[in-house]
Amino acid sequence: MTVTQVQSGVPNLTYQVSWEIPEDHSLLDEPVENTSQPLLAAALRESLELIGFLTPERLVASNLGICATVNGKTIVKASDWLYAPRVLPLDPPRARRSYTPRVEGDIPAVVMEFLSETDGGEYSARPFYPYGKFWFYERILQAPLYVILEPEGGTLEMRQLAEGIYQVQQPEANGRYWIASMALYLGVWHGTKAERTGYWLRWWDENENLLLWGIERLEQERQRAERLESYLRSQGIDPDEIP
């Protein structure tokens, strides 16, 4: 068990944080607040999977409870999306129902929230149990990057931990944010995927190439095949007769 003392920034308030979950603790499932949240999270994961970014040693998850014990009380906060660079792999067919940093792997390098139309808890800095999400990520978890997307208007905010406090970051000239721990850019893209039309979070590589979804790759291949067929016919070759 790892125990750390954390200064809260509030006078006379210190946290004792331990990274071990009691055996009898029952995880509470946080409901997904709207249909856009799982679609946004799945789209982020899909393009990473297609480039081979996902490995058993890396954790990319959505709506997964991040666990800590603070002053003897167990805290579970489910982020809409998270990335941890190194974790202890689970033996199949076990599924990960929660994640306890330091015990099961690294502190998440990136945590994300997609704003809902409810109480705006993603910005909550409540320093007392059960703690606001913003406060939990900044002071207790101390995740290096906290990303917030407002899906309706496409507003993207990124905060980086500096001396224990989140500082708002400015996008680069291309309008995107460089995430060094993933060697990728993160930005906003507007379009349609599945049944949803609107703003999406997308990845770009270091050369600013958009990481495509599966359906986009298929369309790219279809267009390439059409161009090849057109070229062959222009040369007097019938593609259907090529063995």
State where each predicted segment sits.
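Acidic-basic catalytic patches of nuclease active cores, encompassing PD-(D/E)XK
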Residues: 32-62, 69-82
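C-terminal interaction segment
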Residues: 2-33, 50, 68-73, 84-110, ...
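A structural signal for short, well-ordered beta-strand segments and their strand-loop junctions
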Residues: 59-61, 147-150
